[in-house]
């Protein structure tokens, strides 16, 4: 697997050896590799030319913010590299990474793609931000940026016995998963920072007992102590947002 091999010139050497490790035959082939995959090494980043690109106008403070804000849509290897782009790294390296990040997503117009994403970051900051956290750093902000706008959002703020919560439902995710839900709740009941408690999306937090946690203030001892139990009886008989979608 040469996915992570930096671009450059190489000699591919094939050798045939006997049981005594004596060379019987050898063939050498020159290859030139242009790595158009993920930029995941310092060597690859250094090769990027950002002269005359949209990154020219950004200060180091802006670059630090922008790199942090793209984490929700970055691959794991990209996120690891972003973490390593600390304050000690020269700003030009951060520019190279940011520019290539969007070139990989839209080679024809990376600036347009970047501006579209930046608008979404502004949206989640406005909708989900708190006095202490930018919206893109919250669970709802991250999910919105990663998967897009939900097909439906069911919000419950004053449901008896339950913490404030929201159900986000997606008919289809970008990777073609279907009928996906996300459950967020706000256990402190004093902020706008809703925490992800359950989802059926691959790679996301999955808790079969999320409803028990949501209604723990009114759940019976048997419902709480039975660790195979995933439901809490509706003792009031009113509307419950959790009943809108099963996931």
What is each PLM-predicted segment?
Residues 1, 8-16:
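A short tyrosine-centered beta-strand micro-motif
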Residues 3-7, 26-38, 45-247:
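Residues within mature, well-folded domains
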Residues 16-18, 186:
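Residue-level signal for short segments within beta-strands and strand-turn junctions
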Residues 20-25:
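Short, exposed coil/turn segments at beta-strand boundaries within extracellular/luminal domains
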């Amino acid at each position: 697997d040469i996915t992570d091999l930096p671009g450059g010139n190489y000699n591919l050497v094939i050798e045939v050896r006997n049981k005594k490790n004596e060379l019987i035959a050898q063939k050498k082939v020159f290859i030139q590799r242009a790595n158009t995959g993920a930029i995941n090494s310092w060597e690859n980043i250094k090769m990027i030319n950002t002269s005359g690109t949209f990154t020219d106008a950004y200060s180091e403070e802006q670059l630090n913010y922008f790199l942090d804000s793209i984490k929700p849509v970055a691959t794991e290897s990209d996120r690891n590299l972003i973490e390593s782009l600390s304050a000690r790294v020269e700003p030009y390296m951060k520019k190279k990474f940011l520019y290539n990040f969007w070139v990989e997503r839209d080679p024809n117009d990376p600036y347009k793609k970047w501006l579209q994403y930046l608008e979404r970051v502004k949206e989640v900051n406005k909708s989900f931000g708190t006095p202490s956290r930018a919206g893109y750093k919250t669970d709802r902000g991250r999910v919105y940026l990663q998967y897009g706008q939900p097909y439906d959002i069911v919000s419950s703020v004053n449901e008896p016995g339950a913490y404030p919560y929201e159900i986000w439902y997606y008919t289809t995710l970008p990777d073609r998963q279907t009928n996906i839900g996300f459950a967020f709740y706000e256990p402190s009941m004093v902020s706008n920072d809703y925490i992800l408690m359950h989802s059926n999306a691959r790679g996301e937090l999955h808790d079969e007992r999320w409803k028990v946690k949501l209604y723990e203030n009114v759940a019976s001892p048997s419902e709480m102590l039975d660790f195979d139990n995933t439901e809490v009886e509706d003792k009031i008989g009113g509307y419950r947002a959790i009943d809108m979608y099963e996931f």
